[in-house]
């Protein structure tokens, strides 16, 4: 039977690790439905900008980059604010906010009033709400799932992510072809509403976090970064993950140009090349737990962290035809399988190393840094491709990735941190 402890933690339905508890089940369900909604609407805004508003490449690029970067900046003060609020109401509020602003797009389209500025504002609001939700969700997960089961929980989230990445875009593309360009945005909005209902159903008490100061001070905005950069265990993990993700994502637009333009692949071939390898994420996420049980967390973290950066340089050698398509799929499968192992292990270690009263600030700072780094590197690699050529820019990113294992943690952590004292929170 499920039970609720005095601290508001929902205990496991089944003893012995077979169940992660009713509360986690609802959290996982909420994550699943919103993730599938988001992947259904993958690249929906650029498509709407092109198909409905006749936007050119510069405006489409600005829409993607500005939404990411401005949303991240807007979210900076929200991490410290979320830390000292009950997390589930924050998650529900951000879900409902995303639902409302996304529904404004099909509504404006139906009324003939949709404009580029509205798409830009909606993308900024959704990006900021997404960062805020993730910060609160990390704290919620740590409260719902006991330490030894965190890896299993993160493995389930990772498997869900790659399943949605594999199935969502093709289904979304078919829906756009049948029903028009805004249908997937409406579906994404509904997914956030369902997510809010799932979080509401978690049940159990949630105590109000306590802090010494009654008001948020300007210095509190940097608390997350101060904690991460001062931690000898978290700092290398932070620098490695942010840089690797940024370099991988920076080449995504360049690969589209290379494959769809220079090499003449059809759009369906391009979609297939990146959809099928997502099976690697399912394989990797299922292997993470058994690998850690056999070889230990630190060894699996470092090995998968190294393996994930060995693949992207191969994308610089893609050629036309079936051989080129197979090369891309093989490289992406290896990359995604390695990431599928690495991500749940790294996410688990990050939560284990972060005191409960600092999780929201830490995750917010982490996500903001990741999004800003990705936006900056994407813009930089676009300029680099214009100067050196697309293939050369892809190769350079791959070579730089080979140096990133130097930033991986050298030593395993030995114990979980104790909660920091309220006075330290300012």
Predicted regions and their residues:
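Alpha-helical transmembrane-bundle signature of multi-pass membrane transport and export proteins
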Residues: 1-426
